[in-house]
Structure formats: structure tokens, C-alpha cells
Amino acid sequence: MYIFDGAMGTMLQAVGLEEGYCPELFNVERPEVVKNIHAQYLQHGSDVITTNTFGACGLKLEDYDLQDRVKEINIAAVKVAKEAIAEFKPSARVAGSMGPTGRFLQPLGNMSFDSIYDTYREQAEALIEGGVDFIIIETIIDVQEMRAALLASLDAREAAGKTKEDVQIICQFSFSEDGRTITGTPPEVATTIVEAMGADIIGINCSLGPEQITPLIEKIASVTNLPIICQPNAGMPQLINKQTVFPLSAEDMGPLMIPIVDAGASYVGGCCGTTPAHIQSISDAVKAHTPKERAHIEPKTVITSRTKLIELGHNVKPLIIGERINPTGRKVLAQELRDGSFIRVKRDALDQVEAGADILDVNMGVAGMDQTPLMEKAIFELSMLVETPLSIDTLDPKAMEVALKNYPGRALINSVNGEEESITHVMPLAKRYGAALLCLPICSGDLPEKAEDRVALAESIVNRAYGYGLQPHDLLLDPLVLTLASGEDSARQTLSTLRLYKEKFGFPTVMGLSNISFGMPQRPYLNGQFLTMALASGLTTPIMNPLNYAAKKAFVSSTTLLGWDPGSAEFIKEYGYEDETTAPGNAAPKGPDKASFDSNDPLANIRACVEQGEKEAIIDLVKKALADGIDPLDITKKGLSEAMNVVGDKFGSGKLFLPQVMLAAETMQAAFNTIKEIIPASDSLDKGTVVVATVKGDIHDLGKNIVAALLENNGYKIVDLGKDVEPEVIVQAIKDNKAALVGICSLMTTTMPQIDNTIAAIRAAGLKTKVMVGGAVVSQDYADQAGADIYAKDGIAAVNHANDFFETLK
């Protein structure tokens, strides 16, 4: 059991951290203050102290015009920590802190993966040069930012000639009360992604108190054997006598850490509001406690999206990989991709998911086109649109890397073969980006006909994968499907290969279904029969068209007969009421939650576009609706606004997450822009003016930016004053813009009192403007005590409150 320290910001605030002063500059200008804080933690039980470098990456230091001093500040911080250790506890170790940049990566934001990687790489190199024992990437709310920071840390460690025995890399996420990060990632998904990429220790810090975090630690422990770290807040902050107070006393916090230790954490400490006294209490409690023995987790083959994890294998129900996002043999799709349109790609994705696809295969191989930008665009679009994990289907190493880099999850690579060029290009990418890898038994153009030869070649590919550091649970096998036209024995050999794979390796198996019938008549019938036999022979994951009625029915029937459909519930749901005399087509079934594009009602089609994030398609629909004489206000109220209400409800119930909400909002904005282009006088579409700002002293604006974007995309004129804004500036902006509503936020507990000051300044100016407040550390109670009119817990709540308020002004 290792005890980390507590909050640095809380302690700096106690010794007089001034608003507008960079906390990390203490390492250079007032090192004795930082050393004294470290000393207090060491004297109160800390085995590991964390450097005062939470905001010391270049992108954060830009806020203080200190971006050219990254190396100096970080090395100074490590030096101060080491001096404290040498004097007060020589056995202790140093963790180099790297906090969030405050930016979202594309497509949620405008930062590229490489730019975020570069800023973390610079900081990690400085911390390692200084001599840290750990890199601790903490308080991260977006898995893409964590992936960039983790890769940067791994690369910096390797470049310095260090190993994990020298410098361990810790990944700590922050989760909201709903058990997910702000961008929708649950603990088990976050853990799976970073473990596959090479994290050494995984856990949670900030955002919640011990009692709320305990079940989240249990979820992490359910999917990994890696060490777990937990550093909760001292409860959620409260406003008492205009001072920010964390409710958990030191005496209360220690015992509350016992369930966290029993859940699996072996590294514990504190975050916001915790002091040396809290750490002493935690140390006393956990070191006197004998933790429960942690269950060993057998590794499983899993892939994820940003929000969803699925397991593949012989011990779980077979899954479908949808094959439709592939321009091969699809002239219309190929031409649309040449034209830069992804409308059909997105509709294919939605239709396949609705029809039962568990994974979506993504192939951007258009003849004469560079796959790399097409693949990047596809990954951006699909990762925002659907929860379904993706399979990256390309032979182009550049396209493969850009897809893996920008995919916010653990993808499946389709595929690697036995050729040296394929192995040396693909396997390092799978290892680097934590992807699962499909192995195809082909080498030098040779297509082994016999099952035994395929198995032998597959074994050689598997052994090469082990040499690159991949593990058995990272690998899947393709039995190789040759068309019946190539020989009457081809189907039998594929089925034999499946059986041998299961017997020898036990890995999940994946194969393209439609290859078997190429060049044959009655293809759907042959495909369905072959699928049934393949599933019975050990196929776990067919690549198929789930919209094809015959293939889908064969799949559901087979899984029912093989015992994967308890009570035949899925079969009855799909086919129990079917008229056996009819010959159904290949259309995707329309479920009750599926917005339809086929309605004769133009407003219904517009609503469907918003709900499904069809920001390209909605332009033509709005143009047609206007041409047909539909009033712009009806388009806005009965089309766009109603759709966003549905999106908001789904967000509130956990059916949609921030990426999907942002995409829907962008679609709505595209519609507004189209209306205004065609009817410039449509000023009545502007709902009102809202001033937004982050309060004085707070340099964090990520949450404010989300709220501003959602409000703007919902038809409001936004006056964004930025971050660290003086109350007087906010007051003047309200006057200048005649704003009826102002939104102010604070992320830092140290700047929460500025919410009170800003509201007081607005009231003193005699303004009747309604004040809406929010932020990670703000609660309803805090908002009430501060005198706010509205508390918005998130961006959707802000939009709903704004809609309700402006409706009262009409």
C-alpha cells in the first residue's frame, strides 16, 4: 500500500496564492513554499509526493506567457520535491504531475492529436530529466487527451533510455456523478483503452468524494489486474460564509478510504480539499487495515468505442461486423467519397447499427484517392455519430495510423497477413495504439487451400505478434474464405480451419461471409447456409451485411439454435410476428428509437437529421422545406427545437453522450445558417443574446466553451468574454449587448468566490439580467447561496434553462 499526498492548490491558496499568478511559478520564484508543502505531506504519511506541475505544459503556461519556460519550471519542481524527500523522508518517491490542457481534441474541439501529444511530450521529457519515479497524468476527462498524454509519456521514457522499472506511468481519469467522464467514457472502457496502450497504473482522482468513487474503482478492478490508484476530493465543495469549504474532515475521510482499498486500490491519496491532516488520517486508516484479496481477472478479447466495450470470443454470443462502409463495388458511394460527401457513410453506419451490427468495418479504399484524409474524416464522423466500436479496414499504413491515432477507443485492425511488409508495418501500430489485430493466413500472394496449411501460417503470424509485445487476447484469426467458384472443397476447408483454430488457439474468429458466393447464383441463400455452418464450426464474428434479410435471419436463427438466445427471445422479437408467405426485402428494420428519413413530412425528416447528426443532409432538407413554403419559424420550432428536446432527453437518460449532443447541435446550426442565407431577414430566428465568461482568476474555459457552443447552435447570439474575466468587464458587456441572460462559471475551487463577486457587481449596477452559473465545482446549493437565478449542471441543462427563460420574455 502506497500513500500519495493531497491537494497542492488548496495548500498554495492557504499561503496566499494570488489571483492571476501561475501556481507552477512557485517552483522557480518561491521554491521554499513548495518545499514546505511537500515536507508537511511527507511528515503526515505520504510515501509519494506529487510535483507542483499540474498546469506546467506549454498550452497551459501560454495563459501566463510562460510557454517558453516549460523545461525550467518542471525541472525546478522535481528538484524541490527531491530536496524535501532528502530532508524529511529519504524512502519517499516523486510523481511528476501532468494535468489537462483544457482543450478538446478533434472532432470535439479544434486541437489535433499531434499538437496535444507534442505539449505533453515536452513536459514529460522535462519531468523525466528531472528524475521523477512516476509520471502521473491526472484529472483527465477525455480519453483522447489521455491517449495523447500516455503516448507522449511512453515515448519520452523510451527516448530517455528508461523502463517502467525506472518510471511508472499513471493514468488518472475524473468522472462525473453519472459514473462517466464528461465525454461519456465509463471506467471499464477507459481502463481497457489505456491498459492496452501500456499504462502501468490506472485510477481516478478529483471530481467526487470517496463514497461516490468506490463503485467506480470496483468497475476498474473488474477489467484489469494492473495496480489501481484513487485520490478523491474531500467531498463536494460548499459555500459557507462566502468561503469555499470541502465538507469531509480529516477524521471522516480516512475510514471512507477503506472500501476503496477493499475494492482494489493499492495507491491512495487525496485531491481537492485534502490537507496533510487528511493524508495522515488516510495513512493511519488504510495501513491498519488488511484489504480484501483482489480477484484475478482473466484477460479477454475486447474492443471499445469512446463509450462502449464489447467482448469477442467463444464464451460469448457471436457478434456481427457490418460490412457496408466499403466503396469496393459500390460506385455511388465511391463517387460520393470523391466528392467529399460522407452522407451515405453515416447513413450506412446508422442503418447497420439499427439492423444489429455490433462492430462497423470502415474501408475508404477509393481507386485513385489518397485513403489517409478519407479515413481520418470517416473516423471523426463515425466516432461522434455512433457508440459502436470500429474495425479499421485498410492495407495503407498511413491511413491505418491516422485512423488509430484519432479513434477514441480500442479499435480492431482488419488486418495483418504473413508478408514481412505487412507484419513490420501493422504490428507496431497495433501495439502502439492498443488495437486488437485480425490475422489473415496469406503470404506472398499465396492462398493456402488446405486447413492445415492455413493454421500453420496463422501460427507463424501469431508468433511474430508475440515478438512485438502483443498478447493472445489482442489477436483474432481469419480462416480465409475462398469462393465456391474456385473449387468445390473451398467451403469445407474454411469450416475445418475454424474448428482447428478453436482447438489450437481459442482466439475469436472473423471472416467475410459474402466471399463464399462470389460469382454464384442465389448468393443470399448460399451465404445464409454457409453462415449457419460456420457459426457451428467456431466462427465468432462474421463480417456481413446486417441489412440483408437472409443473412441476418440465418445469423439470428443460428445463434438461437446454438444456445446464445435464452428463451429464443431475440428470434421471437425479430421474426415471431412475420408472415411466412411474404418475401421481405433487404431494408433495415425501423425500431421505435430510430428516427426515419423516409417520412413524407418535411419537418419529421428535419427532426431525424438533427437527432442523427446529419449536418450535411439537413441543408438540402431545409432548402426544400423553404421552397415548399414552410414557414422558417415552423422549421425552427416544430423541426429543430423539437429534435433537440429529444436529444436533450436522451442525454439526460444516458442514451446519448456529449459527442452526439455536439453533433446534433452542429446540425441544428447548419440549418439555422441555411435559413439565414436564403432569407436574410430571418432575425426572428435569433432567440436572444447571452453573455458567457469564466470568472476572474480562473483560466479554465473548456466547460464554458461547451455551453457557449450548444447555446449558439441552438439559435442564441453568444458574447463570449473568455476566461479570467473581471466582474466589471462582464457588467459592461451586459450593458453593451443588452443581454437578458449571462452565464458565468468556475472550475477552480479557489475562484468560486468570484461567482459571488460577479453576481454582486451585476446587482450593484442595477441590471435585471438573469444570472446562470455552472462549473465542475458548482452545485445547486452553492448557486443558491451565491444569489444566482439559474444553476445549470451541464450544457444541455443550460440550453433548456435558456429556452425556458427567453420563452417568458415573449
Task: For every predicted segment, state its role.
Residues 1-476, 482-810:
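Domain-level signal for soluble alpha/beta catalytic cores
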